[in-house]
A protein has these predicted regions:
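Conserved SGNH/GDSL esterase-like catalytic core that processes O-acyl groups on lipids
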Residues: 57, 65-135
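N-terminal secretory targeting modules
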Residues: 1-61, 65-72, 81-83, 111-121
């Protein structure tokens, strides 16, 4: 589980968990959503024999949607990697934004975690509701 989620659970108070709240907390955080169903698992996706992305390197930068929150960290990056036989680099953290001036913003993570010397064929940046809901 992501450290931010754990911190959020602790901040919400352990009493909710102690009072039968574990099920409710898991349900609220997405662990019982359809995205976790076996029928949606990335391993079931057939790959394309011919794809313009085959063997290409694709970078995905984003927040929870890119990370695959509520789908056990399987999201469109894994789907595209499997379907199109490409190399995916996923840099995603729940609750982050493009514009915040903090250590886990998209820009900071791109600077800190993505090798500028790496050959990249496609760059996909997920703009999220986190940006719209923050100052």
């Amino acid at each position: 589980m992501d450290a931010k989620i754990i911190a959020g659970i602790l901040a919400a108070g352990g009493a909710a968990l102690a009072a039968g709240g574990v099920y409710r907390m898991n349900k609220k955080t997405g662990y019982f959503k359809k995205g976790n169903s076996v029928r949606y698992d990335v391993s079931r996706i057939p790959f394309k024999k011919t794809s313009p992305l085959k063997g290409k390197t694709v970078v995905f930068l984003g927040s929870s949607v890119t990370k695959g929150f509520a789908a056990h960290n399987n999201a469109f990056a894994e789907y595209i990697a499997k379907k199109d036989s490409c190399i995916c680099i996923k840099e995603a953290v729940n609750g982050t934004t493009l514009i915040d001036n903090c250590e886990d913003s998209y820009i900071e993570r791109m600077r800190d975690n993505l090798d500028p010397e790496r050959q990249v064929d496609l760059f996909i940046c997920q703009l999220s509701t986190n940006d719209a809901t923050r100052n």
